[in-house]
Amino acid sequence: AHGGVYAHPGVPIGSHPPGHGMATSPAVSQAMDGASLSLDASAKSSENSDRGLLAMSLGNGSADNIEGGADHGNSQSGDTEDSTDGSDTNGAGVSERSKKRSRETTPDNSGDSKSHLRRCQPTGEINDDSEKAIVAVRPGKVGEKVMGTVLSPSMTTTLEMRNPASTHLKASPTNVSQLSPALPNEAWLQNERELKREKRKQSNRESARRSRLRKQAEAEELAIRVQSLTAENMTLKSEINKLMENSEKLKLENAALMERLKMNS
């Protein structure tokens, strides 16, 4: 009879004998080596049996022995190598019960464990001498090593290595403003020239208007002065005429007085 072995939670373990149609990657083989070292320690701990993952069930043991190993966790790893007897039906029942137990213990990662079990199991019929391994793999542990590396935002891709200048130009928004500063400057200078020209024209118009108003005011003042001077001239002429009349009268009086003097002498 063979007992079930429970690994520490989060440690994917598995063991596939070579030559039975299974191809193992280096990452999976490293996980298997680490699992074989931790079998003895995990079998002795009864507390980890309830919270651990069912990772491997070896041999063709009965279902009763597997349940006893799950409840008590005291089965030794040496029991897995004692006997290779059994039948295909017992092996199928053990594998189905172990699959069900693995699905019950890990409900979140059921899809990933099923896909990994399908990849790990051979396509042909299971022989009596072959050992069956059911590996429950958590996503992010062995899958990352098998599938490849995950690109992070800080990693430099091949396109960035080939064209570093273009990527820097695209990444930095300040370069966009530095590429075309000429056109806005020229337009700004032309607009400034137009503004200066308009200001100059406006100042010329203002100065011409001020000079015109000043000349108009001076002309009005001169017209007023001319009118006043003409009025004074008319008054002077009238006074001159009066004086001439007075002088004529005085001349007549003088002539009359001279005749009287001649007559009296």
From Swiss-Prot:
It is found in: Nucleus. One of its GO terms (molecular function) is sequence-specific DNA binding. Residues 222-257 are annotated as: Leucine-zipper. Residues 103-115, 191-209 have a biased composition (Basic and acidic residues). Residues 1-133, 167-218 are annotated as: Disordered. PANTHER family: G-BOX-BINDING FACTOR 3 (PTHR45967:SF1), G-BOX-BINDING FACTOR 3-RELATED (PTHR45967). This is Transcriptional activator TAF-1. It comes from Nicotiana tabacum. The gene is TAF1.
